[in-house]
Structure formats: C-alpha cells, structure tokens
From Swiss-Prot:
Family: Belongs to the YABBY family.
ZnF region ranges: C4-type: 21-48
Tissue occurrence: Expressed in leaf sheaths and flowers.
UniProt KW Cell membrane keyword: no
Name the UniProt record assigns to this protein: Protein YABBY 7
Taxonomic source organism: Oryza sativa subsp. japonica
Amino acid sequence: MSSAARHHCSGLRERLGCVQCSFCATVLLVSVPCSSVLRVVAVQCGHCSGILSAVNLPPSPVSASIELTPQELDAGPPPGEYSDESSGDDREGRDAEDDAPAPAAAAVANKPPGRKQRTPSAYNCFVKEEIKRIKSMEPNITHKQAFSTAAKNWAHLPRIQQKRGRDSC
C-alpha cells in the first residue's frame, strides 16, 4: 500500500491499513477510527476467525485520497503501517528481545471452534483396553502386534459382551 492510504485524520473519521493474518496469511483491510486512543487494536480474520493485533500508529502528516488500487491492496502491509506483532512507539530503540512474536498461548486461545468430540464406539473402547491388557502381559510387544491381537480378540468375542453398557471407555 502506498502513501495514498496513509492520510492525516483532520476532517476524516478513520485511517486505513493492511494486516496480514498470521494464521491463514489472508491480507485484511482495517479501518481504525481517528478518535481511537488505543495504540493496538484487535482484528478478527473473516476467513479463519483468528484474532490478531494491529499496531495503531499515529497518523502520518501526508494528506491524500483514500482510493486504493487493486495492486496496492495485494501488495501487503507497508513497513511501519500495521503489523500483527506488538510493538513500541518507535522501531529504532527496540531491543532484539522485543522482536519476538506474541505469546503462543494467545494463538491457541484464538483458534476457531473445532468439531464436537463423539463418544468412542464399543469397538474402540474394547481395543484400547485390550491393547493395555496385552502390553501389560507382554511389555516387549509392538503396538502393531498388540492392535492386531486386540482386533482378533474382538472378532472372536461373543456378541452378548459387545452390547454391554454404552458408557465411554
């Protein structure tokens, strides 16, 4: 994006900038109200629902139009405009440790909701317990061999035992 998107807020209500999602690499066009006193704003990606932070820098003294060409939108965020990392007031006085990305705990908490976990089937419960039993009797057996034996034991199991309680393993 060129200086056409960076404009002074006098007379305008918002500033525009680009943020690249760190989860799915989608480039997002962000408008920040000029009245915002926050240095960092939260942005939610419409593609993956990931939440990232955009550094809200003070308005540049350049006054220009807000029109963006398609090439400017595809160019990605310019240096110093918006970033998905936390940053201080100026880039020159930063230490190397400040360049570290945001904590990984925030990335884990912002994942889109996954599918609901289903109750394991009777077969899965039986095989899981049977593998534990077989490995306790023969600790040197490979998992593949234990699984094969457990599957054979399931095949020879009377059907009455298979239909017992539907509680999870």
